[in-house]
Amino acid sequence: YFDEINLKKLRYCILTAEASPVNLIKEWGLCIPNAKIFNFYGPTEATIYCTFYEINLNGIIKDANGMLSIGRPFNGLDTIILDDNLQIVDKGEKGELYVSGDQVTNGYWKDSKRNDKAFIMFNYNGDVTKFYKTGDLCLQDDDDHILYFGRLDHQVKIQGYRIELGEIEYHARKSVGGGNAVAFVYQTHSNSPEIALCF
């Protein structure tokens, strides 16, 4: 399909809303050879965009499980990655991404229960700051780029082990050279959870 598209005059391409597979973006990049390509990330609560990553198709493309990096925060925004005990993780360690800054919402209108679940006050750089809990599993690499591993609610626990369904999907796609894959948990007749994979 991409072979039929030629958009040499396009100057900018911004990817948003969903995690972007590197192999698909490489193909798309051939259709827009003169465009700068950016991957933007952000939940609605952060007024949609809070981080960005400029993709260099002629260089190394940062990714996690085949999905593009979400980059670094825009000016005026802060991101932190915390563990289950609300401690900042070391670079290279996975945790939940939190965002803060002027464009992050003050909260949900007249919904204190939801606000209590979605926001935390955190001592960051000497200031107690309000952060939004994204629910996204990420890590920060040595270059301060944020790598996205999927939703925490897409992570499952089976027999005491945390399993990232997105990682299973990535390896399935990689084994056949692309395409789609979906991993999910189902209950067997004996009521024990098992993982199924369709690709």
Show the residue positions of the predicted features:
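Gly/Ser/Thr-rich phosphate-binding loop
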Residues: 1-69, 78
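AMP-dependent adenylate-forming
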Residues: 33-39, 54-199
